[in-house]
Amino acid sequence: MKFIILLFVLTNAFAQTSDLRTIAEKSGWKSTGRAIETELLCKAFQKKFPKDVACKSYGKTPEGRNLLYIMVGDRNPKNPVVWAQAGIHAGEIDGKDAVFWLMKDILEKKITSNPLQGVTLIFIPIVNVDGHERFGKWNRPNQVGPEEMGWRTTAHNLNMNRDFMKADSPEMQAMLKLWLKVDPIVSLDLHVTNGAQFEPEVGIIIIPNEFHGSTSLHKAGRLLENGLMEKLKARGHKALPFYPSFEEEDKPSTGFGRYVSNPRYSQGYWYAQNRIGMLVESHSWKDYATRVKVHYSTVLSTLEMVGQHGKDWVKAAEETRNNVLAGKEVNLSYKHNDKSRLIDFPGYKYKIQKSDITGEDVIKYFPDQPENWKVPFYEVLYADSKVMAPKEGYIIPGTHAKWVKEKLDIHGIRYQSWKPSGNDRLEVFRSTTKEFAKTSFEGHQQLVVTGSWANEEVKIAPGAIFVPIEQKRAFLIMQFFEPVAKDSFVSWGFFNPAFEPKEYMEKYVLEDVAKEMLKDKNVAAEFKQRLKDDAFSKDPAQRHDFFYRKHASWDVKYNMYPVFRK
């Protein structure tokens, strides 16, 4: 009944289109509205500002709710586009209320200079709408306000901010289609932190950035970072150019580090698409009003920066996309090294104490006692995974072509039919080590492999597809098809059966087979040499496999990745 009354009040209020304030603003930043408020606001903005606002749907959720986006600005197709998405984790909903507030202030000319001059804003108020409607007071126990909020995951219990590459959720598939269509130069993902307590209000990660590369787009990322830090400081905010997560959990003395996100995450994915990605994390222990305001200021400052530099950044992005990767060494991922510098960090007094509840050490903060921490900051990165790109591209056999094509279509990757020529000389990847995850993660059993590519003769059956490396999404293609990449199809378990043994040789059968094989002097000498290794000598399974792998019955496709390179 309460919800029906609220719906009636909202419908009548927005029908007048004179008051475009959110429930959050009307409540003094104590509450946030439901999804119906977003729909009504979307239409009300469009009605009041038809030349500046377009309210559109880009799909439906599994539970039948509308997926909405709002286009704000003069819609000149030559404008650089800024993408701002909120509520991918629906309990972290600051961005929804912040951008509606900012839109109102811009369109009602409460901001002196128009930050949308020459810029188009694409705003998704709620990415995870089904999760948003799982409303509750304790959905975010590590967060101060609003009074009620949505849930982290979708109706399928998927975390959408792990879904950018595999795109399992219908919501992600729909959103990526829209993202490709509008092609933003800068994309913001608006979140709220978990974790420690400290003074700064927001942490912002921008990639690409000069701390891990030197292209024009990396330089653009650093320029945006520096500009945002200056603007946010001028607007009275305490902001950080990194995500404030301790190197070791609950140990402030271990400090912080920079990192380049893998493409399962929003900002890592946008970087893999050769665009600028921003993760904006307001601090969960600040009150809702403070958090909404810092999101407001961050989006406003970003619009100002893109208005000033956006066209140059678009050119830089296209230059980066047009870089030919074929046959070159490519850095797939990064880590920071052990070098650090001490920084002053505005934290709070804390102590580590033994818990009477769990018996372990826990941290206790004293937010009423600010304290300067001198902690290490790790900012020197190195590539922890490097791969030579194929000279021409990747070949996917017909057995996997159907589902692979569906994934490639979602991400805007071009492919074509492959015409086999009998036995093709191709690069084949065979794993030397593999480790399956012990538990399911996001509905997948992940797999980590090591190995190498080597030339072999391969017979490809009809129905295969070819993904050329010379296209503008080449870096993203390598993230999908290089098996050692952290978010590749292999890593997400799409090819697990290829790395599972299916046939075997009984122990009693091997006894006779091995004795016959030992009549070969070369085999006997190799076996004798291997027996000098204690690990081999004491492991019956390794000794068994030594002979089985040399036998004609051995499965030559076992541990062979069923995608090839040319």
Tell what function each PLM region has.
Residues 1-19:
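Bacterial Sec-dependent N-terminal signal peptides
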Residues 17-68:
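Short glycine- and acidic-rich boundary segments immediately preceding or forming the N-terminal edge
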Residues 58-60, 72-73, 86-88, 124-128, ...:
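Active-site-proximal beta-strand/loop segments in catalytic clefts of secreted hydrolases
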Residues 65-66, 74-81:
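Proline/glycine-enriched tight loop/beta-turn segments at coil->beta junctions
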Residues 78-88, 93-253, 258-264:
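Active-site/substrate-binding loop(s) of hydrolase catalytic cores
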Residues 245-426, 430-431:
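Hard-cation-handling environments
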Residues 354-492, 496-515:
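Feature captures C-terminal
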Residues 473-475, 484-566:
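Accessory, solvent-exposed terminal regions and/or long lumenal/extracellular loops of proteins
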